[in-house]
Amino acid sequence: MNRLLKTIIENNRKWISEGKVASYIPELSKMDKNLLGISVCTLGGEEYWEGDAEVKFTIQSISKIVTLMLAIIDNGEDYVFSKVGMEPTETAFNSIVNLEAKESHKPINPMINAGAIVVASMVAGKDSDEKFDRILKFTRKISGNNNIDINLNVYKSEKETGHRNRALAYFMKSTGALKGNVEEILDVYFKQCSIEITCKDLARIGVMLANDGVSPYTGDRIVPRHVARIVKTIMVTCGMYDASGNFAVHIGIPAKSGVGGGIVACAPRRMGIGVLGTALDEKGNSIAGTKILEELSKQLDLSIF
């Protein structure tokens, strides 16, 4: 497996030149464009990795699957999806278009920024600190890594420059789609996106989902089976933003990307995969990371379709 991973990384390194690091968050623009790594965890608990698999980077939008799991556990799926939809979108992850166009004004799915902000508001906690503390502890639990923490520099950078997210949140507040204190909810959202992880952490989260919510390391149920199923389904339809259909055709497994360059993926009942490739395509997905997953999926016949 390690030889295969090494070959796949080298085969797809050339794609880095066609992408660029996220620049709209100043701290992210400082990232090394050439980082490339992969980690794979099997249902048998075996781990393989190559490249920059132990380099820390911020989770960004991959945190949306973490908070979605937590919100469903806290509130039940019916309540959560009464506040946010579950349909794919052809618009960008930070677009306001669908919020204005739809009569209900509720966000179209939990993987776009507007939807994730509403989901963050549904995580239980008496204040923003308690909500984020629960998100952080849950991230540690599902990854099996108690050392995961927030990158304060990225958090401050996001908070200072997150004008589009503020606009989305205040627009939803004005239509009644978002309840609660907007700045407190945004604080939770900016913090959750600034959690620092590695490819290895992502692969462990992926394998937990691949195993229907059960840790292959301990045998403990971490997430209810129906929650894992819902999240994997949303990952297939919406996880790669407005490139989700293309990803489903060419790679065919549940996945979620983040503008930090990470992608978490899972091949149900087979393996979890974590990829880092900081150079992004025009959709905000890791360009080399996506190509790595495409080659891995073809080599191991991972597609669920």
Curated annotation (Swiss-Prot):
This is Glutaminase. InterPro entries: Beta-lactam/transpept-like (IPR012338), Glutaminase (IPR015868). It comes from Clostridium botulinum (strain Kyoto / Type A2). PANTHER family: GLUTAMINASE (PTHR12544:SF29). Substrate binds at S61, N113, E158, N165, Y189, Y241, V259. The keyword Nucleus does not apply. The keyword Hydrolase applies. Homotetramer.
